Amino acid sequence: MLKTTLLFFVTALCEIIGCFLPWLWLKRGASVWWLLPAAASLALFVWLLTLHPAASGRVYAAYGGVYVCTALLWLRVVDGVRLTVYDWCGALIALCGMLIIVVGWGRT
């Protein structure tokens, strides 16, 4: 379970970075060269999703819970926005959903 969660976390970071760098280019006037590491990050994101031993749709559904938490961590650390009680509750619910799916994928 811990290995799966850590892999989902790294996967989420790759996805967020791969989307954030083009956002910097489009919204903040960063160099177009940032699109190269963005593309590499998104390619790594896709590859990481293939490392799980479950059906793709089930992996994507479970990954979503960790993605929500990682995005909120990004919101706090990178964007500097303080998390609300609603953010924390949403993250907890998302992680519970991920846990239920991951525990169940070995039993089907």
Curated annotation (Swiss-Prot):
InterPro entries reported for this sequence: UPF0060
UniProt keyword Membrane present: yes
GO CC annotation, single: plasma membrane
Transmembrane segments annotated in the record for this chain: 6-26, 31-51, 61-81, 85-105
Keyword annotations of the record: Cell inner membrane, Cell membrane, Membrane, Transmembrane, Transmembrane helix
Top-rank taxon: Bacteria
Main location: membrane
Protein location: Cell inner membrane
Disulfide bonds: none
Membrane topology designation: Multi-pass membrane protein
Stretches of the chain found on the membrane's Cytoplasmic side: 27-30, 82-84
Periplasmic side: 1-5, 52-60, 106-108
Family: Belongs to the UPF0060 family.
Protein known as: UPF0060 membrane protein YnfA
Upper lineage: Bacteria, Pseudomonadati, Pseudomonadota, Gammaproteobacteria, Enterobacterales
Gene this chain is encoded by: ynfA
